[in-house]
């Protein structure tokens, strides 16, 4: 069994449909940041929708597109034109420990297969079938819907991996037999004063061998990945907590608020305060 399959089966995603939305010409669906081990997903079946994220990114969804939010980030869906829009909304609940795995994924995953591909044909039939089953009282309906929702997630992760260099992302590190434990420790204790030496000791490797293996797998350095994860965790906290910036900065390993501020701007293109304001505006 491959590493991704083991990870997905270990966390056993449990999926549900929450809403079948039929929307008019002027609408908004705001969503606040939620529990970190829960994935929200939206499938567009008619019309078009705009998806706004706290980073300032804006995406347009078309019929047949499915978007999943692995970090349960704040977001807002809204109308694009005056046409009516139909959206199926649901969630996937994973084991609490899956929040570390989910943090290694991007904030948004899209399932938009190439026309007439096997995945496209399956998805075109799966969404209406899922809607029909969710309205029925047939035996096994909950299990069936859950498995279809989980398949959305698996296909979306696979599609994302296919679009990026599979040897150059944090997920590849998490799935690596020697480096996975290192990433796990970074995620569990972002505020620890990690050094390359202390990280190498987790992998039971020399500093030089560890640094070389890490670069071979990720294309970057251990401390660069640590910085990225620390800032991602900080962004998650800004979306969910009202703690002062300095407290959050210290909790993810920054002794100086100014250095944290500069790093956050480099990563997200906005200040911590601006990020919080964007989250507030997306889900007032």
Swiss-Prot record:
Regulation of catalytic or functional activity: Oxydation of Cys-21 leads to partial activation of RclR, followed by the formation of an intramolecular disulfide bond between Cys-21 and Cys-89, which stabilizes the active form of RclR.
Claim: Transcription is one of the keywords in the record: yes
Keyword field: Activator, Disulfide bond, DNA-binding, Stress response, Transcription, Transcription regulation
A Pfam entry, by short name: HTH_18
Induction (UniProt): Autoregulated. Induced in response to HOCl.
S-S pairs: 21-89
Keyword DNA-binding set for record: yes
Gene3D superfamilies reported for this sequence: Homeodomain-like, Jelly Rolls
Top-rank taxon: Bacteria
Domain called HTH araC/xylS-type: residue spans: 177-278
Protein name, as recorded: RCS-specific HTH-type transcriptional activator RclR
Native species: Escherichia coli (strain K12)
């Amino acid at each position: 069994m491959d590493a991704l399959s083991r990870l997905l089966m270990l966390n056993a995603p449990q999926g549900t449909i929450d809403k079948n939305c039929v929307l008019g010409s002027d609408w908004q669906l705001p969503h606040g940041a939620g529990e970190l081990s829960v994935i929200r997903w939206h499938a567009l079946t008619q019309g078009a929708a705009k998806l706004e994220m706290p980073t300032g990114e804006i995406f347009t969804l078309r019929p047949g597109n499915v978007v999943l939010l692995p970090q349960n980030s704040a977001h807002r869906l809204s109308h694009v034109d005056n046409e009516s829009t139909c959206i199926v909304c649901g969630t996937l609940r994973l084991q609490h420990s899956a929040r570390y795995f989910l943090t290694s994924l991007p904030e948004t995953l899209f399932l938009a297969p190439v026309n007439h591909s096997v995945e496209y044909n399956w998805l075109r039939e799966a969404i209406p079938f899922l809607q029909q089953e969710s309205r029925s009282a047939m035996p096994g309906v909950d299990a069936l819907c859950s498995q279809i929702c989980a398949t959305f997630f698996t296909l979306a992760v696979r599609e994302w991996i296919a679009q990026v260099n599979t040897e150059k992302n944090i997920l590849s590190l998490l799935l690596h037999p020697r480096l996975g434990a290192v990433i796990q420790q970074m995620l569990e204790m972002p505020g620890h004063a990690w050094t390359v030496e202390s990280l190498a000791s987790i992998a039971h490797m020399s500093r030089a061998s560890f640094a070389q293996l890490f670069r071979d797998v990720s294309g970057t350095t251990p401390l660069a990945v640590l910085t990225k994860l620390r800032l991602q965790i900080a962004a998650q906290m800004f979306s969910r907590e009202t703690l002062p910036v300095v407290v959050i900065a210290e909790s993810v390993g920054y002794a100086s608020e100014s250095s944290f501020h500069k790093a956050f701007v480099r990563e997200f293109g906005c200040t911590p305060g601006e990020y919080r304001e964007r989250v507030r505006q997306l889900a007032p």
